[in-house]
């Protein structure tokens, strides 16, 4: 560790925006179905870095910004793939935003076999439970979900991308 940098003064700046995105894809293999879902969600051509589920304090919810190709993008995401024709898969994310703006928010992600309504209901309940466990008050919960009814190999994807304003 560099002795000149205190852990309190980390060289890494926390992102100050979050964006919810969701998409679906169906093609001839799981990886391309996932990639197609990223294309549909508008978050392709970047490197998603999977993170645990914390929204930095005071982060602003914004539409997905124009992120340079190849960027490393901190992202909490869920996805579900299937090769069973006619099966519906879904993925959802939610963000619980605290009343106390000095606190962090909670991002939850979930995926399942079934429709997006049930998956979105589940992920919203997960965010609520996370706040209850911490004893925090919720200002609001936002969420987004996708579903894909499989024809070949299908993928449903939902994410919260963290970025900088």
UniProtKB/Swiss-Prot annotation:
Listed cofactors: pyruvate
Residues found modified as Pyruvic acid (Ser): 53
Record's keyword terms, sorted: Decarboxylase, Lyase, Pyruvate
EC numbers: 4.1.1.19
Gene Ontology MF terms: arginine decarboxylase activity
GO BP term (any one): arginine catabolic process
Sites marked Cleavage (non-hydrolytic): 52-53
Pfam families: PvlArgDC
Catalyzed reaction equations: L-arginine + H(+) = agmatine + CO2
Cofactor note: Binds 1 pyruvoyl group covalently per subunit.
Superkingdom to which the source organism belongs: Archaea
First-tier enzyme category under EC: lyase
Matches recorded under NCBIfam families: pyruvoyl-dependent arginine decarboxylase
Family: Belongs to the PdaD family.
Protein's UniProt name: Pyruvoyl-dependent arginine decarboxylase
The species this protein was found in: Methanococcus aeolicus (strain ATCC BAA-1280 / DSM 17508 / OCM 812 / Nankai-3)
């Amino acid at each position: 560790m560099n002795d000149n940098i205190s852990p309190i003064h980390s060289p890494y700046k926390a992102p100050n925006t979050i964006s919810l995105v969701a998409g679906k894809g169906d093609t001839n293999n799981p990886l391309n179905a996932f990639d197609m879902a990223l294309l549909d969600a508008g978050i392709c051509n970047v490197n998603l870095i999977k993170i645990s589920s914390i929204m930095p304090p005071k982060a602003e919810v914004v539409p997905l910004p124009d992120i340079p190709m190849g960027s490393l993008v901190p992202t909490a995401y869920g996805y579900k793939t299937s090769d069973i024709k006619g099966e519906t898969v879904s993925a959802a994310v939610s963000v619980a935003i605290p009343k106390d703006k000095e606190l962090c928010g909670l991002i939850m992600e979930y995926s399942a076999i079934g429709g997006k309504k049930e998956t979105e209901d589940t992920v919203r309940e997960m965010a609520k439970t996370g706040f209850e466990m911490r004893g925090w008050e919720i200002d609001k919960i936002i969420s987004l979900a996708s579903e894909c009814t499989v024809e070949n190999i299908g993928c449903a994807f939902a994410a919260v991308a963290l970025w900088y304003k």
